[in-house]
C-alpha cells in the first residue's frame, strides 16, 4: 500500500517477483539493488536479418498493444510550456493526475510520442555518443492505475510484445533498486530493462506524493533503440540512413532532423521559448555545412516524423525556414564558401 510519505516506506515490488514466473532468476543485495535474468540467458542472439522499415516496426508495436486491448493515443503537442518548453517525454500526458492531483489525464494507452531532449550523452569534444539523439520517438504506454498489481500486468505484456519483435526474454535483463524516489510532487519506483548490453527502456510506477491514490504507470522505450537492439546495425546508419555516409557530422544531421520535427509542428525560430530552443539546436549547423540547402534531409526527416505526428507544415516550407535560420547568422560568408565534395540537397 502506498502511504502519504512513501519515501520512508519503500514499496516492495519484488515480493511477488514482479509477477514473473519461476523461469526467471532474481539476485538482489542489501541496498535493494536487483537483477533478474531468464534461466536460458546464455543462448546466443542472432540479429534480425531483414530490418523492418520504420512504419513496419510501428505497425508491429501497435498491433501488439491492440491485441491486449490497448488503443493508440494521438501525440501530445511539441510545444509544452509548463515545466519544459518542449515535450520531452510521453509521461507528461499524466501531469494533471501526478502533479496536480486532478482526476484526469491528457492521454492514456499506447503513445508513440516524438520528443526533444537536450540531455543526450556526449563525448569529450561535445559530440553525441552512439545510442543518443536530440529527438526520437518515445514508444510508451501511459496508464492511470488504482492498484499496484496493474504495474506487473503492464510489465508482463511488454515482455510479450518485445518477444513479438524479436527481443526475447532470454536476452533481457531486468534491473533496478527496490526503493522509492521523490522529485517535487511526484514519487516513483523504476525498473529498467536492457537487451544484452544495450539499455532499451524502463517502466515506472508513479504517484502524487500528497495523494498516493493519484497513481499511474509509465512504460517507455525508444523506437530507434528498439530497432538498434533488433538489428545491431551501426547507430548512425540506423538513425540517418544514407545521410550518415554523406561526409556530414552526425551532430549536424541530428540538428536538422530535430529542427524538422519542431518547425513541422509550427514552431518558428525565436529569441526565447520553444523557438529559442529551436534556434539553439540549429546553431550546431555551420553555414558552410549545407551551402546548397538541406531539402533532401528535411524531406526524409519529415517523412519519418509524419509516421507518428501529423506535421502542420509541408516539407518544402520546413526546409525554407531551416535554411533561412542557418543563413541568418552569416549570409555573406555562406555564399562565398566553395562547394563541398558531397551534398545532401535535392539541388545537387
Report each predicted region and the residues it spans.
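Structured aminoacyl-transfer and RNA-binding surfaces used for tRNA recognition/handling
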Residues: 2-279, 289-306, 310, 314-348
